[in-house]
Amino acid sequence: MIDINSSSSSSSSNNNNSNNNNNNNNNNNSNVFEINSSIKPYFTCIVFVISLIFICSSKNIVTKHLPIGRAGSSIIGATLMVYFGIIQPKEIGSVINWDTIILLMSMMMLSNYMEQANIWGMASKILLWKCKSTSIFMVRVCLISSIMSSILTNDTVCVTLTPIVISACKSTNLTFFPFLMAIATSANIGSSALPVGNPQNMIIATAGGLNFFNFFKVSIVSSILGVCLNTILLLLYFKKDLKNLNSNFNQLIETVNPKVEEIDNNHHDDDGANNQSKNEKEMENINKEVEEEQHNNDDDDDDGFNENKNNNNNGGHAILLVASSMDSIDLSDCSIINKDKKKKENFIEIYFNSKEKSIETIVNIIKLIFKFRVAIILTLVLIGFFIGMHMGFTVLFGVSILMICERKDITDIINSVDWELLLFFSGLFVLVEGFDRQFEKEAWTILEPFVPIDSTHLNVLKIFIFSILILVLCNILGNVPLVLSLSPRLLEALAPDFTWILLAFVSTVAGNLTLVGSVANLIVAEKSKSYHEIGFLEYLKFGVPSTILVILIGVPIVVLIGK
């Protein structure tokens, strides 16, 4: 006899074995290469440190022999983390912060549309328009750099504004270094005002779930004061250089200002000519109406004169008086009717004319909206931020509207996106996550005592030490890697909003400490190397006092407003 139970059990065991084999195969596929758990921390530390050396180094012996760039270093490090089982391949989708990637990509697209709308052309005119001294020129550079950085990210502003300022300095024989420092330092401080000002702010806002308006109301005050203080320090530090106002600078201003004024005058003349033509047309219409009324009155008088003449030729005075009175009444009624008809005709004509004018006005408004579509979309995007809409997709929605309005192939827009930067951040998310999984306890154990988490009982010493640690670590590890490392721990600790905003402010301003502290600094140095090569110590002499003073003033404001 055949034992059914044994056969069923054997079949079930076979199924279990096959399932286990499938699971093992799946695990082998997901874990590309599994290394020993005891080796993982050492391997992770080596990969992370070497990757950071390549990422943070601008030009040294290592990068000269292997110039793979930041994106290459990030991707190689992330690949090693995944290939050797530190992070599973199926986890990559959850490790990468897609909100930040989408926000970065969409802001780059919007920035390209703003460049097409000649926003930077207007900025260059503002820089030199009626500029009477180099000090005023310095202040304008600081203001434009900081304001534009809060909206378009500091990296984008440094890429675009640096050639404009270099061209102005070259034409006027001004020294380059003071104004290059103004671009870099003002861009970093100004970018701290909004969550879209720089990549680390975007990461903090998306990871911490911060409300745009709450971030803005806390950071805007410290950012404005920081920009003002930094501008004053620039004017004092470069006082001797700014005094060298030469004749070439005045000559340039004299040649630039008349062109701007000529454009304004032409614009006003065109408006005046249009207004004058409109007034002449209105006067002609009024004169025609007056002539028609006089002509009608003359016709009425002629009719009355003929009637009286006919009445005098008839006999019977009483009958003639009655008849003449009756005729005069009838004729007056007819004249009233004729006038009413003409009034109705004039009313209809005026109605249709006003209707045509209203249609013309609507068309002009539509044309005006289309002309300033980029500025309108930018304003609506900022409004969307303030009311709490998703930042990345809000910008992408605005960009989509501009794509429809342009009705052009978007190849140029796609090419304007810095895909290398997006790949760099994607790899960095994976790289930092791998390091964080192996050393989260050790790193957090060192930092946790100094992290201001309790918003009800503020410890001044703890806030001070936390700010100093962030300042130093940002210039060693980089602001973005540090923010990525701290974000998961702050989420677990349920850190209040002011802790996140404090991290955003200090990590952003910390970029002004050294030349390699911020990507924006490196961009300015790279763009200006043909005219002035910024030295590390040369930058450090101004960067250290400026950064420390801005943090000393800005941190208390962030804590007091944000708590």
UniProtKB/Swiss-Prot annotation:
It comes from the Eukaryota. The chain crosses the membrane at residues 35-55, 67-87, 91-111, 176-196, 218-238, 376-396, 413-433, 463-483, 500-520, 542-562. GO terms for cellular component: membrane; plasma membrane. Keywords: Cell membrane, Coiled coil, Membrane, Transmembrane, Transmembrane helix, Transport. The keyword Lipoprotein does not apply. It is a multi-pass membrane protein. InterPro entries: Arsenical_pump_ArsB (IPR000802), Cit_transptr-like_dom (IPR004680). Pfam families: CitMHS. GO terms for molecular function: arsenite transmembrane transporter activity; ATPase-coupled arsenite transmembrane transporter activity. Residues 262-271 have a biased composition (Basic and acidic residues). Residues 273-303 form a coiled coil. It is found in: Cell membrane. Its main location: membrane. Residues 1-26, 262-284 are annotated as: Disordered. Belongs to the CitM (TC 2.A.11) transporter family. This is Putative transporter arsB. The lineage of its organism: Eukaryota, Amoebozoa, Evosea, Eumycetozoa, Dictyostelia. The gene is arsB.
